[in-house]
A protein has these predicted regions:
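N-terminal accessory segment at the very beginning of proteins
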Residues: 1-157
């Protein structure tokens, strides 16, 4: 009997082509061929929540950022499917979800880009501690600054 105990290190993993889409009122779920699920929840006309799962299932729902008591609601909410993307539209925002890469672009109705994925969501399996190391790469817009939390070895922007 031959037993192979070596782990296969896969490096960075990325969502691939979206194969299914469904909508449940204000929640939009996009599932890729390799089991990544993107869930977009419309909280308000100008506030969205993005969740990702990497193995066809979400962890229990929890967020420090969203209060249970926060007011919710939106005016118009529409979704359309184009050849290469899905488009979710509220009265204030447009969210484009690329069908091939699951990358996101958020803009206002005048076409000003507010937030845009560069590489977007990706992850790496953590064999030492279990689970995944989640990564996100965004395009920085003109005059935009980024200030992250936690320890810094250099300037915080």
């Amino acid at each position: 009997m031959i037993t192979n105990t070596e782990l296969e290190y896969k490096g960075n993993l990325y969502p691939n082509q979206i194969i299914s889409f469904n909508q449940d009122v204000d929640k939009f779920n996009f599932t890729s061929e390799n089991g990544v699920i993107l869930q977009i929840t419309v909280l308000r006309n100008s506030a969205l929540r993005f969740r990702y799962a990497t193995e066809n299932v979400f962890e229990p729902d929890f967020s420090y950022a969203i209060s249970e008591d926060a007011s919710r609601g939106y005016g118009d909410l529409e979704v359309s499917e184009e050849e290469s993307y899905y488009l979710i539209t509220t009265t204030k925002l447009k969210v484009l979800v690329d069908k091939l890469t699951m990358r996101i672009q958020i803009s206002d109705h005048e076409g000003n880009i507010i937030n845009e994925d560069e590489i977007g969501f990706h992850w790496e399996e953590n064999y030492e501690y279990g689970g995944n190391t989640v990564k996100m790469s965004k395009i920085t817009q003109n005059a935009e600054s980024y200030f992250g939390m936690g320890d810094k070895a250099t300037h915080s922007n």
